[in-house]
Amino acid sequence: MLLLQFHDHGPRVGRLELDGKVRLLRDCTSTYDLAVEVITKRRCLAEVVEERTDNAQFDYERLLIERRLLPPLQHPDSAHCFVTGTGLTHLGSADTRNSMHKKVSGDIESLTDSMKMFRLGLEGGKPKDAKPGVQPEWFYKGDGSILRGCGQPLVMPDFSQDGGEEPEIAGLYVIGPDGTPFRLGFALANEFSDHIMERQNYLWLAHSKLRQCAVGPALLVGALPDHVEGISRVRATDERVRWQKPFLSGEANMSHHIANLEYHHFKYALFRRPGDVHIHVFGTATLSFADGIRVEPGEVFEIEAAAFGKPLRNALAVEAPPHSAVVPL
């Protein structure tokens, strides 16, 4: 089941059908309000969607062309949405996997911090018992103000050295009144970052992640398939494919259980504040930057996986953010 948020004389929520039509959900203007209602009434999200599905239809292609799609989950107050993520969690392609195993097979003291973290995940990211596994790398991207929907530009501040894509899957969550995290489902995400800054010094990773993040276009309700295979592309301004590469996700291609990544995020009381929204990305092993690609303004990132329907498309833009010097009081 795939859900969409879009504009039509105000915000709307629709269910994507196999014929490409979007059927409106009655009495529903946001997936956030829908989730809060489902949590409060202790219902099943998929069942409520079935009950609310109306005969009113919209054309998905037209919504895409007219850029009327919104991120699939938002909080009405962007300060109450956390956008965060984990890295070094994916095994990647067979070549990447073999390469990684060779790099981490030596003496632990000779490994870089990144390879140590990857090795920890291989050894303890999927515990056999009910105990928590090893904690992953973790980072903060921003609040809800950085979220962008399909068709909206990803804006790189002019002080950045790079604006590159990271094709990922995100978990989408709302915190219940007793602090319980409830997962609505999953969505494609472009965890947009400055890879040159990160490469210059790994301690600048936190800086490099403070960028916008595209999510959508659709929310996949329910479980994530164990194996997700997609394509990440960079299109030139004339729509020519300049670079493309498959990417893999799902637990079969990860060194951590998703439940383990969720545990190590939500174990902090700060992230269990009732009513808050969390968009948490799970990592990737595929980057155009790793192949020497520098994306130029106006070029388009395109991330696609069959389980999520239409691709997530966002053009790169650059702007000078406003800056004011600090004034002492």
Language model region names:
Residues M1-L18:
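N-terminal basic/disordered segments at the start of proteins
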Residues L4, D8, T40-A236:
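Active-site microenvironments in enzyme catalytic cores
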Residues D8-G10, A187-A189, S193-L329:
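Catalytic-pocket segment enriched in acidic/His residues
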Residues R15, L24, H80-F82:
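Short, conserved beta-strand segments within well-ordered enzyme catalytic domains
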Residues L18-E51:
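N-terminal cap/recognition module
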Residues K21-T31, D54-F58, D178, G216-A218, ...:
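Short, exposed beta-strand "edge-strand" segments with a Pro/Gly-rich flavor and a Y/T-containing core
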Residues D27, S93, A306:
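Surface loops and adjacent helix of pleckstrin homology
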Residues S30, D59, G85, G151, ...:
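Helix N-terminus capping/helix-initiation residues
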